[in-house]
Amino acid sequence: MPEGDTVWNTARVLQRALAGTRLTGSDFRVPQLAATDLTGWTVRESDSRGKHLLLRLTAPTGTPGPEGTSGGGRDWTLHSHLRMDGAWRAYAPGERWAARPAHLIRVVLRSAGAVAVGYHLHELALIPTDQEQSLVGHLGPDLLGPDWDPAEAVRRMAAQPEATIGEALLDQRNLAGVGNLYKCEVLFLRGVSPWTPVGAVPDLTGTVTLAQRLLAANRGRWTQSTTGSLHRGQTSYVYGRRAQPCRRCGTAIRKEELGERVTYWCPVCQPERPALAGP
């Protein structure tokens, strides 16, 4: 599933394919942008912010913006979120597209040297670049961004000491980029139960620092591994391994719902911790 490293990699794919080029055509297949034509627009750069992808463009002088706004000469951002199932793919002109149903395509961007296709994208919006904060300003420090600040991430998490550490790591307002895979793997490696209250976690700084290290290690490759192995079936310690033996102690890995997501953990290596004491 797309997590911060996947979105970072996707942004680099679009950067290589489109940055510095002028679009020769566009096709939006979502109601809010159905009438938008980006032909002649210049792609400046592709960037990621947590799980959000930002494609920044400049409209040619005299070109109307979305819904008749004044767009000419202005900088705009095409925002998309991959959530659980979205993806961008870049192809050479004439290359056969991936075998995905056509009804999943949300946008097609064409330049002289590349075709970028967005599948099952969410929160697709075209906004002035100077208004990006309206879409990503709520996010915590980006684990793969220049603003990464473990102290700030810890401060945000510690503000809700009763929240479970499993849910706190997934809350993008605390730190941006962790998804379910990294949540499960980080907590296993730290020996912390996902149900532990944030206020009872012995070393929050160590926890978020490990999360950043794991995501950073997977930048530039599509196979996500936390074990050091890229072999099929050997890339995770607990995630996706329900009922299989723990790689450390041999106990069967468990799977259970935590909040709105499932979590995987080893009941021996990640023992339950006592709840916070009352006032």
Name the predicted role of every residue range:
Residues 1-279:
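Structured catalytic/nucleic-acid-binding cores of DNA maintenance enzymes
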